[in-house]
UniProtKB/Swiss-Prot annotation:
Protein's UniProt name: Large ribosomal subunit protein uL11m
GO MF term set: large ribosomal subunit rRNA binding; structural constituent of ribosome
GO biological process: translation
PANTHER family in the record: 60S RIBOSOMAL PROTEIN L12, LARGE RIBOSOMAL SUBUNIT PROTEIN UL11M
Major place of residence: mitochondrion
InterPro entries, per the entry: Ribosomal_uL11, Ribosomal_uL11_bac-typ, Ribosomal_uL11_C, Ribosomal_uL11_C_sf, Ribosomal_uL11_N, Ribosomal_uL11_N_sf
Subcellular location: Mitochondrion
Species of origin: Rattus norvegicus
Keyword Mitochondrion annotated: yes
Superkingdom to which the source organism belongs: Eukaryota
Gene: Mrpl11
Family assignment from sequence similarity: Belongs to the universal ribosomal protein uL11 family.
Amino acid sequence: MSKLSRVTRTLKKPEAGGVIRSIVRAGQAIPGPPLGPILGQRGVSINQFCKEFNEKTKDIKEGIPLPTKIFIKPDRTFELKIGQPTISYFLKAAAGIEKGARQTGKEVAGLVSLKHVYEIARVKAKDEAFAMQDVPLSSIVRSIIGSARSLGIRVVKDLSVDELAAFQKERAVFLAAQKRRIWQLRQKLPKSDPNLLHSEVRD
């Protein structure tokens, strides 16, 4: 190998150190993308990361999305800092839904009460991002309400068990009809024009 080639390889080699932020699901860290290649470029053992992350989250319900910071040291070892579940996870759990609205602003995917929002805010107030800046609870509440809006979740003052059950029943009927419509549209679509499906569903 020429001296120039060795210099070029050295220059292209990713630097060790730094912090990688990602959302990783509890107990489900795997060597593949998107995190695997990023860690590999830093010289970090992705298999070791997966083993350590999955071990640290073994007592948490599998699949819960967890904000994770990976502090990479100069010797290419690392430290993990695993945060609490995301706001969107808490909101969807409180609303009893798996996904947000397909068309935000045009449909309501779920309902949560203000009590739910304040409970989530009190939990998230312990997050480093909020705690270190001493963010007021009222600001966290507003942030959560904004997240709810983006998911198509409506925040109401009060919400009884019966009201929630009635809404969920109505929502299930809506989703079933939507699924049928998508299937019908898909049968009519030319295979070369997949984008048309999303356009027609929004109309």
